[in-house]
Amino acid sequence: MKALFLIFHGLNPANGISKKIYYQVNALRACGIDTRLCYLNEPNGRKLRMIDSEVLQDYGAGFKGKILKRIEYSSIVEYAKKENISFIYMRSDHNANPFTIHMVHQMRKAGIKVVMEIPTYPYDQEYIGFSRRKLLFIDQCFRRVLAKQLCGIVTFSDYKTIFGVPTIQISNGIDFSQIKLKQQVNDTNKKLHLIGVAEIHYWHGFDRLVKGLADYYDSHPNYKVFFHIVGDFFGQREKDDILPIIKQHKLENYVTLHGAKHGEELDRLFEKADMAIGSLARHRSGITHIKTLKNREYAARGLSFIYSETDSDFENKPYILKVPADETAIDINSLIHFYEKQSLSPLEIRESIRSLSWETQMNKIINSIKIS
């Protein structure tokens, strides 16, 4: 059986979203499905729609290319028909409009089953500013119409229906072969190293931890806590939330901004770390229940971690510290006391999530829509 994994943007091997997409494609292949990946590429300004390493459609450069890549989907439909594709896995880019609706309608007419993944839901609150709200408005006008054309909506949330369509609930998965297990347990008698890895958005709430460190160091403690932030700031808002606190409270020796890291550099930082920091402010974007990929990656590394949302895969795990979903500073003393009680090894933490492999998660979708 043949499938097409369809996304509406480009790929960057160092980017977390791109890694996730590759994991999902490989998982579908591991389930016995001949899966091709359709994505956009822009070498030298030219807009290309790709199928794996082959060019499907060349839209050219300039304004024309920018428009065509957003409205020309007939080449995808024709490819799916020609190649006898029977299943389309489409990753939403919040781009419901007459063109995507027509594309899915044509696929369904050809007998192709189409599901759409919504990576984060709800997502309206993520659109801040007039220009971004304009883009969202188009999606809001057409997303229920698009949803009616689908065989299902894949979600990592606990929502049973989205846009009036039944959901296929899965968890963000893990490709264990791609994530290195932490090899050593560090001496934490005098210091504790925390790590947060993300493209830094306001909903990660890293500012809550930095505020907690400011409060903690105001008492001149002997026990030292360090926070390693690994990733680039998404925008000025995130910089303004974090950088002034570091400067005002003279935390430069305790909060390190590493920028984006991957590969062996990232592995070394995880070896130095003792505990990880998940999202601490998903409530800022209106989300209470979510199954983030980052939580799973931390567990696969073998680290205990903290977060503030509800993640049903981790709620009762002994290596999880839940903090309130509010704007309070993180209590560093409580975090230290929690860590001191930890007894599980990195391997034991990793083994606790074996059921969250990407192959298991993607197989749920296959079974749900009865692909054969």
Regions found by a protein language model. Give the residues of each.
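N-terminal subdomain of nucleotide-sugar transferases
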Residues: 1-44, 83
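Conserved donor-binding/catalytic core segment of Leloir-type glycosyltransferases
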Residues: 186-204, 210-213, 228
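Nucleotide-sugar-dependent
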Residues: 15, 95, 204, 264-266, ...
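Donor nucleotide-sugar binding/catalytic pocket of nucleotide-sugar-dependent glycosyltransferases
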Residues: 140-182
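A charged, aromatic-enriched C-terminal amphipathic alpha-helix characteristic of glycosyltransferases
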Residues: 16, 327-330, 337-371
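Membrane-proximal helix-turn-helix segments that form the acceptor-binding/catalytic region
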Residues: 26, 74, 98, 102-109, ...
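Nucleotide-activated donor-binding/catalytic signature segment of Leloir-type glycosyltransferases, i.e.
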Residues: 239-264, 272
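Short N-terminal targeting/anchoring amphipathic segment
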Residues: 77-98, 112-115
